[in-house]
């Protein structure tokens, strides 16, 4: 199935049913009062996050969604039936904006999340509501309200813990194949990856993380060159970026340092926040270098690029904010085990910090709530009797 990560749809909530003007008419009751019921409310439109839906392709073909209208009221105090709601299932990670105002309507971050994106109109009032001491036989009633109608822009941002970025043919797809069960296309030409791929790396029965691989970037990507600029948004939700660099390019005219700097520059142009995310350097294809030249080549690259070199003892107890560098061969699995364990250790620390912060916020909220609920004890003067 083609990967579709953007769509534009029109949603229309149902109109509320009209209220009715009616009077009670029964045998032996010649002057029955008003008994007109209200109209039913219009159906609303909801967006529902579904982990079984992977793309927005359905919304490229069906662009208009209309909820059911409410039924009109009836006599004998009968209210109209409300219109049925409709639910639009979307992938987890979908962001919904109002296309006209740019307002954020919903951000679907977890399975089962349900957000109203168009509210149904209220039903009209029947004449039973207008009865008064001075108006015993009201004939007025109100029409139902129109439901919300809006044009929405849907944008899918994949949810992953780690994002891969680099030039085309840097070996990102080969890496994700080597450490996960994902099987993206791999070939010896640029732009083999045409859409984002996700791979789950399982360390044991309880610990795992998700890697996102996007099409390779080229210089000018932030302005629209190449394929990767469309998919950079998929890296915005990741917690760690792996900058994959081909340390041994076939073309002698290709400068790995220049290419690495170009990627960082495109990242900065696209999104300052994305540029500021934790980023590790992964030097791939070291198997293409003679063994006696590897250390010298890597050291020369890091010096020219201006990236700090790690000491041998940095593998344990590393600072999660410190930049790191790994040399691997994704094709031969050389160094990939050490890299995945380092990623898992990093994510364990980050997740533990996030849980700790969430617990602290919950405790603060509970304390504030208790402070509001608990009434202050009345002051007792010294002269009062016990």
Swiss-Prot record:
Annotated positions binding GTP: 166-173, 191-195, 213-216, 284-287, 329-331
Annotated family: Belongs to the TRAFAC class OBG-HflX-like GTPase superfamily. OBG GTPase family.
GO cellular component: cytoplasm
Official protein name in the record: GTPase Obg
Cofactor: Mg(2+)
PANTHER family given in the database record: DEVELOPMENTALLY REGULATED GTP-BINDING PROTEIN-RELATED, MITOCHONDRIAL RIBOSOME-ASSOCIATED GTPASE 2
Record has Iron-sulfur as a keyword: no
Residue stretches making up the OBG-type G domain: 160-348
Alphabetized UniProt keyword annotations: Cytoplasm, GTP-binding, Hydrolase, Magnesium, Metal-binding, Nucleotide-binding
Compartments where located: Cytoplasm
Residue ranges occupied by any Obg domain in the UniProt entry: 1-159
Role description: An essential GTPase which binds GTP, GDP and possibly (p)ppGpp with moderate affinity, with high nucleotide exchange rates and a fairly low GTP hydrolysis rate. Plays a role in control of the cell cycle, stress response, ribosome biogenesis and in those bacteria that undergo differentiation, in morphogenesis control.
Any one biological process term the GO annotation gives: ribosome biogenesis
Gene: obg
Gene Ontology terms, MF aspect: GTP binding; GTPase activity; magnesium ion binding
UniProt-annotated binding residues for Mg(2+): 173, 193
UniProt EC number: 3.6.5.-
Subunit structure: Monomer.
HAMAP family the record matches: GTPase_Obg
């Amino acid at each position: 199935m083609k990967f579709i990560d953007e769509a534009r749809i029109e949603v229309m909530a149902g109109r509320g049913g009209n209220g009715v003007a009616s009077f009670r008419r029964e045998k032996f009751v010649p002057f029955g009062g008003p008994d007109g019921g209200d109209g039913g409310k219009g159906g609303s439109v909801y967006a529902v996050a579904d982990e079984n839906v992977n793309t927005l392709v359905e919304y490229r073909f069906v662009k208009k969604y209309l909820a059911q209208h409410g039924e009109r009221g009836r006599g004998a105090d009968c209210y109209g039936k409300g219109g049925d709601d409709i639910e639009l299932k979307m992938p987890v990670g979908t962001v919904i904006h109002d296309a006209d105002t740019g307002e954020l309507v919903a951000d679907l971050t977890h399975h089962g999340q349900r957000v109203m994106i168009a509210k149904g109109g209220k039903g009209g009032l029947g004449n039973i509501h207008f009865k008064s001491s001075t108006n015993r036989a009201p004939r007025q009633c109100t029409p139902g309200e129109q439901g919300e109608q809006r044009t929405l822009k849907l944008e899918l941002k994949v949810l992953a813990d780690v994002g891969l970025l680099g030039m085309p043919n840097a070996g990102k797809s080969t890496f994700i194949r080597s450490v996960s069960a994902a099987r993206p296309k791999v070939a010896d030409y640029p732009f083999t990856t045409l859409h984002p791929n996700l791979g789950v790396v399982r360390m044991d029965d309880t610990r795992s993380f998700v890697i996102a691989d996007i099409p390779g970037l080229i210089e000018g990507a932030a302005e629209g060159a190449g394929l990767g600029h469309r998919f950079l948004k998929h890296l915005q939700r990741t917690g760690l970026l792996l900058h994959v660099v081909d340390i041994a390019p076939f073309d002698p005219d290709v400068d790995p340092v220049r290419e690495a700097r170009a990627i960082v520059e495109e990242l900065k142009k696209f999104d300052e926040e994305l540029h500021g995310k934790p980023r590790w350097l992964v030097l791939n294809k070291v198997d293409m270098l003679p063994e006696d030249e590897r250390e010298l080549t890597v050291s020369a690259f890091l010096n020219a690029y201006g990236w700090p070199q790690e000491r041998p003892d940095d593998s344990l107890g590393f600072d999660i904010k410190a930049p790191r560098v790994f040399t691997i061969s994704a094709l031969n699995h050389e160094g990939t085990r050490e890299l995945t364990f380092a990623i898992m250790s990093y994510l364990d620390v980050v997740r533990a910090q996030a849980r700790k912060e969430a617990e602290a916020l919950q405790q603060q909220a509970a304390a504030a709530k208790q402070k509001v609920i608990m009434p202050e004890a009345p002051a007792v003067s010294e002269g009062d009797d016990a």
